[in-house]
Amino acid sequence: MKNKILKGSIIAFIFIICLMFITSGVSAETGSNNDTTIQTLSKGGLSITYPSTWGYSEATSNYSIMAISKLDSIDAAGVGQVNVNFEKQPLTTDFNTFINNTYKQMQYDSSFKLVSSGQSVIAGKPAFEYIYTSNDNGIEREHKAVWFEKGGQAYVIMYSAPLDQFESNLYVFDYIISDIQIT
């Protein structure tokens, strides 16, 4: 009888030790993932949330309200190679004509290739979505732009990345679009 109790105690002890190792391993893994927090940025009538692995960056457009970039992609000039740019332009015509004219002008660039276009919704507002590629200083880039109208202004939220980084970072853009607040 003592032999069975001893064997049972040893098995229980080993089981408890194994559980402790498994638990500490899981805690270590989740600890490294918890380093990313959610940031908020509000400007120009838009409020967004994004992961802390991205940050505010310089934009190259005159119409830019704000821009965020993946932190490890920001160059010496402060411009991110993987970025989301938020722009606002006054409408000089109706919204549909404005969008069509914008993409007609872009077609004069021989590197511009429209991948897809269609209707979408952003924060409950009707929107247009365009996905296209272009060549910027020898770097092939893919872009996803979502356009909407508010108060006589055309807004565009555009994600841009080198082709080899586009898909792997697209989830951040999709998260921003799904959570954006238009004020």
Q: What residues fall within each predicted segment?
A:
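N-terminal targeting sequences that direct proteins away from the cytosol to non-cytosolic compartments
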Residues: 2-78, 118-120, 136-140, 150-151, ...
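Conserved polar/disulfide-associated segments of primarily extracytoplasmic proteins
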Residues: 59-156
